[in-house]
Curated annotation (Swiss-Prot):
Pfam families registered for this protein in UniProt: PIH1 (PF08190), PIH1_CS (PF18201)
Major place of residence: cytoplasm
Compositionally biased tracts (Basic residues): 596-612, 750-766
The name this protein goes by in its record: Protein kintoun
GO cellular component, one term: cytoplasm
Function per UniProt: Required for cytoplasmic pre-assembly of axonemal dyneins, thereby playing a central role in motility in cilia and flagella. Involved in pre-assembly of dynein arm complexes in the cytoplasm before intraflagellar transport loads them for the ciliary compartment.
Molecular function GO labels: protein phosphatase 1 binding
Species this chain originates from: Drosophila persimilis
């Protein structure tokens, strides 16, 4: 797109539109001088003297002599009239080219040559020429125009009158010279040859060359060198030779006129509001204004104009004014409502075409779509009180609102798996996860801020498709799609029972949950196929199956009868639970029963409070007992040592024990993993539920994984019913040890300091003892030091389970000996503790 104003500025120098640099005083002086009769007479005499041919000849001789003194030979070229070519510059300014002659220009010559394309013989011409500077002039209507002179030898003009091809070559040479020298574009499609020999007044030009043999005086610099024209360089002594043209320049049949497209827009105050749809049509103009420059036409009666919704076509076949223009419009226009106007003074055609905008219904639909895209994802529909501006009709009257019809809208076309996803929309596969529960499957699609209205589902007997969209911070929608298909099985009954009955899809803040419900008699499959669409599916496994809880599952199976023994001591109550077949007691059991009647020491009380766990030997026995009946028959000959688990309860349940001064536990709930036993509301802690329907003891022989064992949830089972927690035990000490290191001291220095502190404390305790107590303390201290040297005595703790197995019979004697050793150590500890308690009591009394 270009404008006429820009092209006029481009040729301002050619038009000589520069204003004269004259002051106001100078202008007044010239005006006063011209008002005098004497000055006017002298001025006219000067003009006549300059235009006199004799005086001009004398002037040329003087100039030639002056230039010769500077070492420059000059020749005055006086162009003689020939013929005139009329055209235009850049399709705007009228231009005349004078084809003149002068004997001062060299003769044209020719050489025999070969045509490189056809191979035919011909003549290759060399045509010398001379050019004058362009000058401004006026045409017959006193309009501004431009005039150029191109001078050839008289023989060249004589040949042009006899040979039409030579004449055409002469004209092309003159046009090329003007375009190359003045950097303009001439209209070669509309050349005219007026009946003129010469346009304007002939003005001579000068050919300047350096002298061939200058004298020493001529080579000396002239005192007025700065006032004369610059000497021509020595390289220009020879005429400039242009490359020979082997192919004629193509001459277009029609010229393309200059044009411009302007977008016209009215000022609408509704576009300056804060509505979301206020500036929807800011970039859409009300109309398009197309301006076409036609300087060679007097009216539009000689041209054809066709306007369509997207283009403009102009054609002029008049001789000397051939124009053709095919223009594509940037907007759809109403060709029936346009108008055209031709300016005869400026030779300009203006076409005004209104732009077709969308209808009111389409604009309202676009407004609703924009509101939907810009809605905040807060879970609550936002309704704005302000409505979008309503477009008025052409007559300006508001249309009457017709009565609403009760006709139901047409049903949308049925979706199929092939047409469910649009080809023009790019879909992404979201991250997903699957959970199964009986005959239901739940898919969690990890996509946040999903628009609930954008969720569309498609269900078949064996597959489900879902698509939805989410809006980002830039109001740009992102589309997602998910396709799930059940695995194919050849059985007809399987297909009949395992079919998808219904689906539910719900959008949350951070994801989308889709639920699939299969037949009532079917179960969730172990695998499924998923992907973006039906092509390129991938198989996924369902890792977790969960069964819904029923009343039958909640009912506890009756435990086999067990033998329960309750022994009450001074400080605690010991409950022993044994299976009915473990009635045989061993020597170790008798010793343990005797030990229970004794007063427990401080360490024993702490040990009894610790929670016991399974050992590896007990787990091995569970695996053996979990074998089939053949395993039981095979191990029937092996003597089975009765298995037990003892737990000491404080008297916390009045309904079972009926004692006073109870210490209740702080554990208020069971483990989060595994099944929970049913407890009555009257139990305030786990200790209150000791005699509930779920026993607190663990019987490995009858119930390998009873409901009272709340451990780590099992993941991979090597045997059915056996948890991996049986093979891993963790014991925690009640005493918390803390070691603090100072940053400005070494560890060894702190160790010595702590050892010194302990020695001081020990000496202080010795000073408090009497003579008899000191002796007992020394004996007790020696015994304690010996026990520290034997780590096998104090570091072994009873886990509360009788370790039985294949090697249990071989270690019966060793166990009895180690038990006696531990009993001796326990007696010594009890004695030391009693002595320390007595010392504390004496200190309190003091």
């Amino acid at each position: 797109m270009s404008t006429a104003a820009g092209s006029r500025k481009k040729h301002s120098k050619l038009h000589n539109e520069e204003r004269a640099d004259i002051t106001k005083d100078e202008f007044e002086a010239i005006r006063e001088a011209l008002s005098k009769e004497e000055f006017r007479k002298l001025f006219f005499d000067y003009v006549e003297e300059v235009q006199d041919p004799e005086n001009r000849k004398i002037y040329e001789q003087e100039i030639t002599q002056l230039e010769k003194e500077r070492g420059v030979d000059i020749k005055f070229v006086h162009p003689k009239p020939g013929f005139v070519v009329k055209t235009s510059i850049d399709g705007e300014l009228k231009c005349f080219i004078n084809i003149a002659s002068s004997p001062e220009v060299a003769r044209p010559n020719s050489e025999v040559g070969m045509n490189p394309e056809t191979g035919g013989r011909g003549l290759s011409w060399s045509i010398p020429m001379a050019q004058t500077g362009g000058r401004d002039d006026c045409d017959a209507k006193n309009n501004h125009c431009k005039v150029f002179d191109v001078v050839f030898h008289p023989d060249a003009l004589h040949l042009s009158t006899r040979d039409s091809q030579f004449r055409k070559a002469l004209i092309d040479t003159a046009l090329d010279a003007v375009e190359r020298e003045y950097e303009v574009a001439l209209d070669r499609a509309n050349l005219k040859y007026p009946k003129l020999d010469y346009k304007g007044i002939a003005r001579p030009t000068v050919i300047r060359k350096l002298a061939a043999n200058p004298t020493p005086e001529e080579q000396e610099p002239h005192p007025l060198e700065h006032m004369y024209p610059t000497k021509p360089p020595a390289s220009n002594s020879e005429p400039k030779i242009l490359p020979m043209k082997t192919k004629a320049a193509p001459v277009p049949e029609f010229a393309v006129p200059k044009y411009s497209i302007k977008q016209s827009h009215d000022v609408d105050l509704s576009e300056y509001t804060d509505e979301l749809d206020a500036k929807l049509h800011v970039t859409v103009p009300r109309s398009l204004v197309v301006e076409i420059e036609l300087p060679l036409l007097r009216s539009t009666a000689e041209c054809q104009l066709d306007v369509t919704a997207k283009s403009v076509y102009l054609l002029s076949e008049r001789l000397g004014a051939k124009y053709r223009l095919k223009l594509d419009l940037p907007f759809v226009v109403d060709d029936k409502a346009g108008n055209a106007r031709f300016d005869t003074e400026k030779r300009r055609l203006s076409i005004t075409l209104p732009v077709v905008r969308k209808s009111v219904n389409q604009q309202r639909q676009m407004h609703d779509t924009l509101r939907y895209l810009s809605r905040e994802d807060s879970g609550v529909e936002l309704h704005s009180n302000s409505e979008s501006p309503v477009e008025d009709d052409a007559d300006g009257d508001m249309p009457e609102t017709p009565e609403l019809e009760t006709a139901a809208p047409p049903d949308p076309p049925a979706l199929t798996p092939s047409t469910f996803l649009k080809d023009s929309v790019h879909y992404q596969l979201p991250k997903f996860d699957c959970n199964a529960l009986d005959n239901a499957m739940a898919f969690v699609l990890d996509v946040a801020h999903v628009q609930p209205d954008s969720i569309v589902t498609l269900k078949t007997d064996r597959s489900v498709s879902v698509k939805f969209a989410t809006i980002g911070s830039g109001y740009y929608p992102t589309h997602y799609a998910f396709y799930m298909e059940l695995p194919s099985v050849d059985m007809e009954e399987y297909h009949k029972d395992h079919c998808i009955e219904s689906i539910e899809a719900e959008a949350w803040d951070n994801n989308v949950i889709m639920k699939l419900f299969l037949g009532a008699e079917s179960k969730a499959p172990t695998s499924y196929l998923a992907g973006l669409h039906a092509n390129g599916l991938k198989e996924y496994q369902v890792y977790g199956h969960y069964k819904a809880k029923t009343d039958k599952n909640n009912e506890c199976e009756p435990n086999p009868p067990r033998v329960v023994q309750i022994m009450r001591t001074d400080d605690a109550v010991v409950i022993t639970v044994r299976p009915p077949h473990t009635s045989i007691t061993t020597e170790e059991d008798d010793e343990q029963q005797q030990q229970l009647h004794k007063k427990p020491s401080k360490k024993q009380r702490k040990r009894n409070k610790k929670q016991r766990s399974y050992s590896e030997s007990a787990c091995e026995e569970m695996l053996d007992q979990q074998d089939g009946p053949l395993g039981r028959k095979k191990d029937a000959t092996t003597p089975m040592v009765p298995q037990r688990k003892q737990r000491s309860y404080s008297e916390c349940n009045d309904s079972t024990i009926g004692s006073e001064n109870v210490n209740r536990g702080i554990l208020k709930r069971f483990s989060r993993y595994g099944p929970r036993p049913s407890m009555s509301d009257s139990c305030s802690s786990i200790d209150d539920c000791g005699f509930s329907s779920h026993s607190c003891s663990v019987d490995a022989s009858s119930s390998l994984f009873s409901q009272s064992f709340n451990g780590i949830p099992e993941e991979d089972r090597t045997e059915e019913g056996l948890s991996e927690s049986c093979k891993k035990t963790v014991r925690f000490n009640d005493q918390i040890m803390k070691q603090v290191f100072r940053h400005d001291s070494s560890i060894l220095g702190q160790r010595k300091k702590n050892q010194k502190r302990r020695n001081c404390k020990l000496r202080a305790q010795q000073r408090r003892l009497s003579e008899g107590d000191s002796a007992d303390y020394e004996e007790t201290r020696d015994t304690a030091l010996k026990q520290q040297g034997e780590p096998s005595g104090n570091k072994l703790h009873d886990s509360g389970l009788d370790l039985t197995g294949a090697s249990a019979s071989h270690r019966t004697d060793n166990n009895s000996k180690s038990y006696r050793t531990r009993q001796d150590h326990a007696d010594a500890d009890a004695k030391n503790d009693a002595m320390m308690f007595e010392m504390d009591d004496e200190d309190d009394e003091i």
